[in-house]
Structure formats: C-alpha cells, structure tokens
From Swiss-Prot:
Residues 681-840 form the AMOP domain. Domain composition is important for subcellular localization and function in mediating defecation motor program (DMP) cycle periodicity. It comes from Caenorhabditis elegans. This is Defecation cycle abnormal dec-7. The chain crosses the membrane at residues 1251-1271. GO terms for molecular function: cell adhesion mediator activity. Residues 1-19 form the signal peptide. Disruption phenotype: RNAi-mediated knockdown causes a significantly shorter defecation motor program (DMP) cycle period; phenotype suppressed in an egl-8/PLCbeta or inx-16 mutant background. Expanded distribution of inx-16 at the apical junction domain of the intestinal epithelia. Suppresses the long DMP in a gon-2, plc-3, or vav-1 mutant background. Similar brood size, developmental growth rate, and lipid accumulation to age-matched controls.
Length: 1385
C-alpha cells in the first residue's frame, strides 16, 4: 500500500538523480531558482520582441581568455562524470576549439547566436551558399537560373562584389566620389547594379583565420513534373539545406554563448514561424502539396537550391510590406549576404583577443532579389552597420571622407539612379534602425520597370499608392492604400475626387477603403488623410475603368453545349457562375451572398439598386449554379421587371462589408420572363420591341448631329486613316477581338472618339470587301439576321460624355440601356430587327471628308500633308506640326538624336526620332519615348501623361481617357510599339517603334484646312500683330495643310522655300535643312514657336554627350560608301535590298544596318498605300432601296461614283423594276427601284391577270356589241319613222289627188299595213276603217287633241322606242263619218 514513506523515498531518489547531472558547483536549490529566473527573463524577452527595437541584441561570444578558462574548468571536472558523459563533454570542447575556424564559413545558423533571425534569411555553407573568393575579380559572376527584370532590362546573370553590390556589368573601378548615372557614359561604363552598401570593403582576418565572407545562392521552386512530393528537410530533396541539422549544430554551441537564446524553437525562416506554418498548411489544403523539381540539367548544388518554403516566406514578407503585391508569388530568388565585412583599409587583427574590437567595426547585411520573371522585388536586410566609409574614400576608421557609402539602384547605360535615404551622406548606418516596412532594418522596393518603394513614410506630406491602381466605375471594390505610416489611433479617410470614404487601418503601412460609385471614367485625383479628414496632405491618382472593359471578378459561365443555358437567353434552364474565393477572403469558412443589381435610367437620373438575392449565406467555394425556374424571388423592388432589364451579379461576404466582386453587365431576361409573359403574353418580345420603338420615336432625333459632325467613312482605308475622329470598337477590331457579337458579318467596326453635344456616338462597320455596311441592305431573312448585322449609331456613347453624371451621358450603362438592350429585344428575342434598324439607320458617307496625313520616319524622312518629300537630318528638339488658331492651338514636337555607333565604330551623322510630345489647347501633355537597347524586351516605348507613367499591357488599359484627349493601343500589341493619340479636335497621331526609332504619322481633319482669303498671304498673316484678323494654318516640318504643295516649306517668319519632288540629292537636302528645317528647332530664340514640352528628367537614350554637342555636321546625302563601311556591306547589296528606294538606301548606308533600311522601305510603302486610298475623296450616291429577296451584284455596298449595281432575285423570287443602276456624280441613274415577288405568288397573279383580262375583254366585247346593237336599233327606228312620214305624206297626197281627180281606192291601201308593221311592231295592227262613199268631198275635221300625259320612263330600249313611236304616230281620223274640208293650202 502506497504510504507517505514511499513518497518521500521516491522524492529523495529523483533529487539525487537530478543532482548527478547538474554542472559542478551547482546545488539543487540554485537550479530551481535559475529556472524561475530564466522564465522571468524569457517573459521579458518576449515582451521586448513585440516592440520594434532600434538596435539588435549584443553578441555574447566570449573572448579568448574566457574560452580557455572554460575549457580548463571543464577538463578538471571530467572525472566526476560517467564514461559516456565524459566523451560527450570532450567532443563539445573539440567543437568549440573549431568555433573560430568555422566562424568564417558559417556552417551553422549563426543568426541565432547573433539575434539576426528576425532580419536575415538563412545563409552560410549549411544553407548551400557559395562563397566569394578572396581575390578580387575571381569567381564573381554567377548564373541566376532565371530571367530577372531590373530597371527595364532583363538579366540571367549577376556579379557579386565585396563592395556590397550585385552588378550586371563590369564597374569602372574608379575611386570615389561616384556619380550615378555616370555622366561620362557612353565613353565610360555605367553599369547596372543593386547596392545595399556600395563602398570599398575587405574581408576581416584574425591571424590566418578569415572571419568575413560573402555568401550567395539562387533559390527556386519545385517543378510540377513528377509524382514525388517535396518534403521539407528530406534527404531525397536533391541536396536541399537541412535546417534541423543546422539547428542541432547551433544548439551544440549553446554552452559557449547565452543559453537563453536557444530555449526558443529554432526558426530557419525568420520570425513568426507559427503563423507561417499555419498559412502554408492552409495553402496546401487549397492548392495541394507542392512537388519537387530538378533544375534543368543538374541537381541542387551549392549556389543553386530548391526551397519553396523559403520562397513562401519571402513572398509573405513582400506582401506584408508592399501594397499591391497580393498577387505576387516569388518563383525564384537570389540571396547574397555580406557577413562581417570590414571597411577598405581596415587593420588586420593578429590575435583572437582582438575579436571583440574587430567585431564592433564589421558590417553584416543581405540583398534578396525575388522574381516571378515579370515582377522583381529587392529586399535589403541590414543586421549590423558599424562603418560608412573606406580609407580609399578618405575616411578615418570607417567614417568621414570625400564620399560615404551609397545604397540604391542604378539602371545602367544612363538610365537612371534611385537612392535610399541617407545614401552618400555618411549616415547610412541608420538604415539598420529604420525601415519602410514593418521590420526595422528591412527595406523593400519593386525594381522591374521603375523603382517603387514599399511600406510607408513618416513625412508630413507626400504621395500615396493604391492597390489595385484602378477600379470599376460601379464601385464597391476594396482598395488598399498606403503612404504615411499609420498609428493605431489614426482615422484614415480618402477622397476619390469629390467622394470621401472612411477606411479601415490594416497595419502600420496600409489601410483598406471601399471604392465609391462613379459616373465617369478616366484618371481622377485621390487624397489621403490620417486625422479624420481635417487635412489631406498625401495625394495620388486613380483610374476609373468603364464597366464593360473592367476585368470581371465574377465570371458568368455560358454553356458551350446548350446555347439555351446562357445568361442572355430568356429560357435558360440552368445558369452557373464562378469567382476566385481567395480573392474575397482567406477564411475558408466564410459565407457569401450572391445578388442581382439592376440599372435603369430615365430622363432625369439613374438608378442602381439591388433587385434580388440569388443565394444567401452559401459557402465560399468559388462557384455556384441554379435553375431560374426554381428561383425563389423576394421582389426587393416593386415592378422591377418594367425597368431594371440588365445589371450586374455581385458576390459579397455575408457578414462583413469588406469589398465585393462584380460581373460584367448582363441582361436579366431569364429573371423577368414570368412577369413579362404574365403582362405581355406569349408574344412578349415583339410587344416590348414595339413599345421601345414607339418610345424611342418620341425622343429627340440624335442622328441629325451625327450626320453633320461624324459621317461614316465610305471605305475601310478611310476609316483606318482617320485616327483622330474614329477608333475601333473593342469587340469588333480586325487587329484585335474579331468576335463582333453585335455586328456579325463585319470585318471591322469603328466608333466616333468624341460624342456629339447630345451624347450620341457614330458607329460604322465594314464588310470583308472594305465597303460600308448599311441597314438598308438588311432584310428580314434568317441568313441576314445571323450573318449581316451592320453598324448602327448609338444614342449614348460607350465611353460617356460630359457632364457624365446625368443620363444619357453615363459610360457603358446608358449605352447598354438605350442601344444594346433594344437590340437584344428586337433582334435576338423577337426576330424583328426591322424595328431596331428603322430607329438606328446607318448614316451614309455623302458628307464625309477624308483627313490629310503627314509622315516622318527613318533618319528622318518627311512626307508633308500636301505631298512634298524631303530628308531632314537635324538634331535636337523640333516642331513637327503646330497651329496657333484660337480654335486649334496645337503643338507636336519631336526629339532627334544620333543613333548608336556603326559596326565600324563611327558616329552616325544622321538622326532618328526618339521622343514625341503632344498638347492641344489646355489638354494633358503626352510624352512618348523610345527605349534604350536591351530595354525593349517587354516594352518598346515609355508613355507619360502629365509626367505620370502609363502602361497599356492589359486589356482594360488598352484605351485610356485623359483631359481632352484619348490614348489607345491595339489589343494584340502587348509591347507598346504602337501608340495612337486622339485629340479632342479630331487630330490623330500614330507612333510606331522599330529598332529604337519612332515613326510619327499625323492626320488632320478638314477643319484644319484653311485657305487665305483673296488679298491675304501666308507671310503677312504670320507677321501680323496679335489680335488682328489673320489667316491661320498648320506649320512645321510637316508643312502647311491647304492643298497647295508650293508653300509647304514655310518658316515661322513666313519665308517659303519652293522645291519639287524628288529631293533626294545632297544639295537639295542641304538647302531644305538650312533654309527651312533649321528654323523649326526649339532653342528658345523664337517666341512664335514657344518652349519645349519635353521634361528634362527624360534624357536622350543613345548618347547624351553627342546630343549636347553643338558642332554637329550632318551628312545630307551619302554619295559613296566609307572605306570602313565597305568591309561590312557593298553598294550592290544596298541597291538590291532597297529596290532603288532612295530613303531606304540613305538609312542603310548611314547606319550600316540592313534591317533599318528594310524597315524604312516597308513603312514608306504602307503609308503610301494607306494614304492613296484613305485620303481620296469619294463620292457616294447612298444605298439603293430594295425589297425582300433582292440580290445585289456585287454583294458589297458599291454605292460610290462609277459603281454599277445589278439587281436580281433569289430562285424563289421574281424581279420587278430596273435591274441595273449606275452611280454618277452622287446621283443614281433614273429608274424604278428593284423589288422581288415570291414566284408562286407571281404565277398566281399572272393567271389571275390572264383570267381577268379574258373576262374583261369578253365583257368589253359584250358591252361593245350591246352598244352597237343599240345604235343599230336607233338607226332602224329613225329610218322607220322617216318611212312612215313619207308613206303618210304619200297617202295624203294620193287621197288629195283622188279627191281632186275623182277616183277612190277600192280597197285599203297596202301602205297602211306596211306602216303599221314597221312603226308599231309591238302593238297589234288596227286597220283603218273604210270611208263610206260620198259624192261630195268634205275635208276631215280634226278635233282638238287631248292634254298630254306624262310619259312613263321605261328602262329598256324597246319601251323607249315604243314611246317614240307613239310620239310620232300620226293622228287618225274618227271612226264615224268623216268630213273633209278644203285645206287652206
């Protein structure tokens, strides 16, 4: 049973066992006290570590006497220990005796004993570093193993020097003082270098032991090319450094130093190991484990190792200190460490007892170049700086002298110098106490293109940085800002132009702000305050990108297999979207909301509101899909289906407002489909299209302004030449994106650069024959709808218009609602494009006037606006073209300098263009420079706007807007070798780069073409006093633009030099140079020209010394080849290469470079070809009207003067009208417009016509027969009447004769019968009663006729005749006895 006695016995045994292993002379109680004291000391050190101390802890290395005393005491106490413990103690003493010898090799982690783990990365032979030889100039060059961009150059090697620098070229080895860049370049070397401590230094020796060294190695990541997983500290990692073994070696030395420093966990990668491990484990869970890599052609070896863990640690330090490096990942690094270096001329220590004294005069620092072969960061780590000058510089004991040590970056070849604080001032030791990041003694800079410091500044004012430097105009994006160092109590606010936002402090170097919504695009000023908005002493610039061109953080995934499942389709069954989850938050357990934000604008204001949630509180997995039919709508906005027809998809954290992610603009037909069908019915597309058609027709006619201000060019060459007034549409560019989603069948589409007063934009498209496509040629046919979509004017410009904030001047959004959405509704959903094209008809080119173009190229050769060609070998700053008009105050200047020396080491006595500067009125000043040789691997030009460097290497940077001008770069041109500047007046300037030379083409709109009035001359106008009425025109090396070549060569004073082409002779070239071109040099002597637009900080790129010389004598035109040049090429080679082109031969002979001559030849041919077709004034008759089914031959829009158009019909149609028309003098030949009818309908109509014709003819015949029959009847009736009257007259005469002569008829006369039969056919005949015989004749007595009765109108001819017969029937005698009386006659 366990008792107290057993417990006491066990305690005594444990105490005895513990006392047996204690050092001699140490009691048990003292050891317990030491433990508590150690814990208190450890707590103090942990507290001190959390505070940024200015000085690193002092070293605890004992001196030689103390070392010997420790060894002697240790030997005396050996007999008290067991055999195995005694052996361990003996091995420890032996290793300590080797301490000094190993000190210079650093074959263990010396950072721990010196307290440098917080500032230096692992170095030494244990880390597989190579060592610099003690002899100067030997084994200094090393292979980096990667391409390292630095100051615009690109290097794959470096040279390590003891003087504290990594050089990319041989230094001049001149004595201080030094000046960088070297002003004597190129006569003297000006080497590129990275210097953490540029001063004469030497290795320190103690006796024959070297305790100083320079270590270096390159570090790389594993290559993902095998299945073996890279394991840290594995023996199979191709010789990677073993940090556990190095830590054990350092622990073995703890008895010779302060034991408290070794009680901590060894951290081979610097500070915050626990955080680093968690971060790496999290990354492994997300991205998987890294695989190891074997470097090309070799395994890991001293000086070149694989260590992804170290690269991750370097990446984290860069991301923590540099705002904007979150997307950076160090793939390679080069680490060089200068360990215990003494100043040049320092005394050599002879005994180890002098170690402490020597140590106090040593410098230890480190340079790290980390790169992903695109971006490069330089890290300077200063562990200990104890001297600042060398004896060679005149210093004494490491201080003073003519020039102290320098720290910074030199681009080399006269590129430029960037110095760190205190550089060359004798106070460089302060760099070890201060920092531009969070760790004292560490300085981080980005060095690939321009030198950009990381971190923050303690100055009271200065600049600020944003990351990213741009944002979408709809805002909501998280922007990191840095500039001043931020204290915990600081209240940070940032003004984005006029919008103030409150920011969250993240660390001492950065804060995070939420970008506000903008209604404009372009460069806006930003200001930063850390006192709550009372003052804004830190400033910078921020670029607002339009929503259409901004990179989409949320990707809307359209189905490839099923075209119905796309975001713009109304009947989509399933939709998917994705986003980068880690760009939103590193918290894998975070929840996100997915929302729909809609946009709508009326005539007064715009509305940007949340419509609904697609999902709430879902996991941040980076993807989401849903079925629109099963979507539960919350209807956050009432009647949103009537207005908010498009918008954005937003992904945001569900529980924090820490920035959001946006998609690109997208329509919402799948969301509003149910409401549309319920309101409009099944035919909702056509009803909505007609509704828009009627609404748009009530608005102002914006096309009137476009017809007068920006008529479309007639052909594609004109559109390509008109650089200042038109630019390509980004998604329909023959030199870029050719998808043309809204203009199928077009080869190239353009839009007007500047909007009209009403904010509209002209848009023109050209087919593959180069002709303008017209909406009049469209017809409602399936093929046309799919493959023929001409350009249409836009009511709202894609890039907006001033004042921007009001509709319809808002970039992208106004255009989407007023132009793109109606197109989708009418053309895509309703299949009735005719409604859209009736409201957006293509403008013709009848009013278009082509621009004039001038060109300067080669060395240099000039082609004026009116066609004069000459060569101008001047040097300096010259006026290329200018205008002093009150409406167009234009200035374009060029910088001409001599190129590189020839292969036979002779100066080229000709010049090339290396810089262009442009300004119009009060616009921004644009400067474009060529780059030095070896600096053209990534960018071919440098572009500065108002002194700020601008890049065009990303899709959303391809078009940028500034004050009164735009700059664009072709989409597929990633090296900035072509820059186009578009001024507000319509002037276009295209700059090409080739072999370090710039070619400049200037196009002027017709508004610059001015002709002096009668009685005025150009000379009198130029000399007229200001304020007096004068004739303004363009002047300069490109001549005057007035369609008169005679006065092209006019000086500022009005003197005209008259020449005629060709001018390719030495005498003519000299005359032009001396009498004309030299007067356009900007040297400050002519007030009419003005000053230089170029900034002084941008020096000549070839030879600044030659550029400054005034005794330059050009070669006007080479007649023969120099003797030295004949050893490189022959005249026969020149002639055969240049094809008898004088300009090509000039450049070939002067430079001795065949490629330069061929470039001149090619550029000249391209310009002449473009000018010939682009500057030609074309006469257009406009499109011819045609109906459905009409086929025009040729199929292109041949509507220009002299074009013949032949019309035909498709096989199922039949043509009508005139089938051939000719355009003459802007008018079509007379004729009926062609139209086609369906063949079946044509046949039916023809049969119907034939039948109707037959029926009509028959009817006409019947009618004609009836008419003739009626006429015949009338004639017969008239004839019968005449006969009746005649018979009656004859009968009366006969009766009279009988009375007179006494004869009487024996019977009734036959004439009575005939009369009855002829004149009263429709009534029965009534015989005349016989007269009783009487011997006495008595004339008949006629009674008075009865009153006439109204005859009855009968519709038939028979009744009419009968009525007529009754009318003309003679009176009949009475039936009784008739008594005739003698007639009066």
């Amino acid at each position: 049973m366990w008792t107290a006695r057993h417990a006491v016995a066990l305690l005594v045994v444990l105490t005895y066992a513990y006392s047996s292993i204690l050092p001699p002379g140490t009691t048990f109680v003292q050891s317990i006290r030491d433990i508590f004291r150690f814990q208190e000391q450890l707590k103090k050190e942990n507290v001190e570590d959390t505070i940024c101390s200015e000085t690193p802890p002092e070293s605890s290395i004992p001196n030689r006497d103390e070392l010997l005393e420790l060894i002697r005491k240790s030997k005396i106490e050996d007999h008290k220990f067991d055999e195995h413990v005694r052996k361990k103690r003996q091995l420890s003493r032996i290793s300590y005796q080797e301490y000094l010898d190993n000190l210079g090799k650093a074959d263990y982690d010396v950072r721990i004993e010196e307290g440098w783990t917080e500032i230096l990365y692992p170095f030494g032979t244990w880390a597989m570093d190579k060592q610099l030889m003690g002899q100067a100039g030997r084994e200094t060059q090393t292979n980096l193993g990667f391409d390292c961009p630095f100051f615009g150059f690109r290097f794959n090697y470096t040279m390590v020097y003891p003087m504290g620098m990594l050089s990319f070229g041989l230094p001049p080895f001149s004595a201080p003082p030094w000046t960088f860049p070297n002003p004597a370049w190129p006569k003297q070397r000006d080497h590129s270098f990275v210097a953490a401590f540029y001063a004469d230094a030497m290795f320190q020796w103690i006796g024959n032991t070297k305790i100083s060294n320079v270590f270096f190695r390159s570090v790389h990541r594993p290559r993902l090319d095998d299945d073996e997983v890279y394991e840290r500290n594995s023996q199979t990692n191709y010789g990677a450094p073993n940090y556990q073994q190095a830590g054990a070696q350092s622990a073995a030395n703890q008895q010779f130093s302060n034991p408290s420093q070794y009680s901590q966990n060894l951290n081979a990668y610097s500070q915050n190991q626990q955080y680093n491990t968690q971060l790496l484990q999290q990354q492994q869970q997300i991205y998987g484990k890294r695989k190891k890599r074997q470097m090309p052609g070799r395994v890991s070896q001293p000086g070149m190792v694989v260590d992804p863990w170290l690269l991750d640690n370097i990446t984290r330090h860069i991301q923590d200190g540099y705002t904007g490096a979150n997307g950076f990942r160090a793939e390679h690094a080069f680490i060089a460490t200068w360990y215990r270096m003494a100043h040049g001329g320092a005394a050599r220590a002879l005994d180890v007892s002098q170690f402490e004294h020597v140590k106090d005069w040593q410098n230890t620092f480190q340079v790290v170049l980390a790169s992903d072969e695109i971006r490069t960061f330089a890290i300077f780590n200063y562990a200990r700086l104890n001297w600042t000058s060398s004896n060679e510089a005149g210093g004494l004991d490491g201080f003073g002298g003519k020039q102290a040590a320098m720290a910074g970056f030199n681009g080399g070849n006269g590129t430029g110098w960037y110095g760190l604080p205190y550089s060359g001032e004798g106070r460089l030791w302060k760099l070890g106490y201060f920092s531009n990041v969070l760790t004292p003694g560490r300085w981080i800079h980005r060095v690939d293109e321009v030198i950009i410091p990381a971190g923050c500044t303690n100055a009271s004012n200065g600049g600020m940085m944003t990351a990213p430097p741009w944002g979408p105009m709809h805002g909501g994006m998280a922007i990191n800002v840095s500039g001043p160092c931020l204290r915990p109590a600081d209240s940070v606010k940032v003004n984005f132009e006029n919008w103030q936002t409150s920011c969250t402090r993240l660390s001492r170097v950065r804060a995070r702000c939420i970008m506000p919504m903008f209604h404009k695009i372009g460069l806006v000023p930003i200001r930063m305050s850390r006192d709550g908005g009372q003052s804004f002493p830190f400033f910078g610039k921020f670029y607002v990108v339009n929503s259409e061109r901004a990179p989409a953080s949320v990707s809307l995934k359209d189905s490839v297999d099923n075209k119905t499942n796309r975001w713009y389709e109304p009947y989509a069954q399933e939709l998917a979207l994705g986003w980068q989850a880690m760009n939103l938050t590193w918290n894998t357990g975070a929840r996100v909301d997915i929302s729909l934000f809609g946009y709508w604008e009326d005539a007064d204001r715009s509305h940007f509101e949340r419509i609904d949630y697609l999902a709430r509180g879902i996991s941040n997995t980076g993807s989401y899909s849903f079925r629109p039919q099963q979507l539960t709508k919350q209807f956050l906005l009432r009647d949103a289906w009537q207005k908010f027809h498009f918008g954005f998809v937003q992904v945001a954290l569900a529980d924090a407002e820490d920035g959001v992610m946006w998609s690109k603009p997208t329509p919402f037909p799948w969301y509003h489909l149910h409401e549309w069908e319920r309101y409009y019915g099944r035919n909702w597309p056509i009803d909505m299209c007609i509704e828009w058609f009627e609404y748009d027709g009530k608005r102002n006619n914006f096309q009137i302004d476009l017809t007068t201000d920006f008529p479309c060019p007639c052909k594609l060459p004109q559109a390509m030449l008109d650089l200042g007034r038109f630019m390509p549409i980004m998604d329909c560019d023959k030199d870029g994106d050719t998808s043309c989603p809204f203009n199928k069948g077009a080869q190239h589409c353009i839009q007007s650069v500047q909007p009209t007063f009403s904010g509209s934009s002209q848009q023109c498209c050209y087919d593959y024959d180069g002709y303008l496509m017209f909406t009049d040629d469209w017809e409602p046919d399936g093929d046309y709808t799919t493959f023929f979509q001409p350009g249409t004017p836009a009511r709202a410009h894609r890039y907006g218009a001033a004042p921007y904030r009001l509709p319809p001047f808002i970039p992208t959004l106004s255009n989407y609602q007023l132009d793109l959405n109606p197109y989708r509704t009418c053309c895509k959903y309703a299949d009735h494009c005719e409604f859209y094209y009736w409201r957006r008809m293509t403008n013709g080119c009848q009013d278009y006037r082509a621009p004039a173009a001038g060109y300067i190229y080669g060395e240099p050769h000039v082609i004026t606006y009116d066609g004069i060609r000459y060569t101008m070998p001047g040097k300096g700053y010259y006026v290329l073209t200018m205008s002093d008009s009150p409406y167009h105050k234009l200035m374009v200047q060029v910088r001409l300098e001599q190129p590189d020396d020839t292969l036979w080491h002779a100066h080229v006595n000709a010049t090339v263009i290396t810089g262009v500067a442009v300004q119009e009125n009060d616009s921004s000043i644009v400067q474009v420079y060529a780059r030095k040789p070896m600096r053209r691997w990534r960018y071919r030009t440098d572009v500065y706007v108002d002194g700020t460097r601008r890049f065009f290497d990303k899709p959303h940077w391809k078009h940028q807007q500034f004050k009164h001008l735009d700059i664009r770069n072709p989409l597929q041109n990633m090296n900035q070798s072509e820059i186009v500047i578009m001024l507000k007046s319509g002037v276009g300037i295209r700059i090409f780069e080739g072999f370090g030379m710039l070619d400049v083409m200037v196009t002027l709109p017709p508004s610059y073409n001015t002709t002096c009035r009668p009685g005025e001359s150009l000379s009198s106008s130029l000399n007229a006093p200001r304020g007096q009425r004068r004739c303004y025109t363009t002047l300069g090396l490109l001549g005057t633009y007035n369609n008169d070549p005679a006065d092209d060569l006019t000086t500022p004073s009005g003197t005209v030099t008259r020449v005629q082409n060709p001018t390719t002779t030495a005498s003519t070239t000299q005359m032009i140079y001396e009498q004309f071109a030299s007067f356009w040099k900007i040297d400050g002597t002519n007030d009419k020209i003005g000053g230089v637009l170029f900034q002084d900080k941008f020096k000549p790129i070839y030879n600044p010394l030659l550029f400054a010389e005034s005794d330059y004598r050009p070669v006007y035109w080479p007649q023969t080849i120099d003797m030295n040049a004949s050893r490189v090429f022959t005249m026969e080679q020149v002639v055969s290469t240049c094809q008898n082109n004088p300009e090509c031969e000039y450049d070939f002979i002067m430079t001795g470079r065949k490629e330069v001559g061929l470039t001149t030849l090619r550029r000249q041919k391209e310009f002449f070809a473009l000018q010939k077709t682009g500057s030609k004034q074309l006469i257009s008759c406009g499109p011819l009207l045609k109906k459905e089914g009409v086929v025009k031959t040729p199929p292109a829009a041949n509507y220009l003067d002299g074009d013949k158009v032949v019309f035909s019909c498709k096989p199922k149609y039949y043509i009508h009208g005139d089938i051939e028309r000719v355009c003459r003098n802007g008018t079509w030949s007379p004729g009926w417009w062609a139209w086609c009818r369906d063949r079946n309908l044509e046949y039916a109509l023809k049969w119907m016509t034939a039948l109707l014709s037959i029926f009509g003819i028959s009817l006409i015949f019947v009618i004609f027969f009836c008419i003739l029959w009626n006429i015949r009847k009338k004639k017969q009736a008239a004839h019968a009447e005449r006969l009746q009257l005649k018979e009656q007259s004859d009968r009366l005469n006969k009766l009279e004769n009988e009375r007179i002569f006494g004869t009487s008829p024996e019977k009734t006369p036959l004439i009575e019968t005939d009369f009855r039969s002829n004149f009263n056919m429709n009534q029965p005949s009534r015989p005349i009663p016989s007269q009783p015989p009487s011997s006495q004749y008595s004339p008949p007595v006629f009674a008075a006729p009865p009153p006439p009765s109204q005859p009855t109108r009968l519709p038939t001819y028979t009744n009419a005749i009968s009525q007529q017969q009754r009318q003309f029937e003679p009176p009949r005698p009475p039936r009784g006895n008739m008594r005739f009386e003698t007639s009066a006659i």
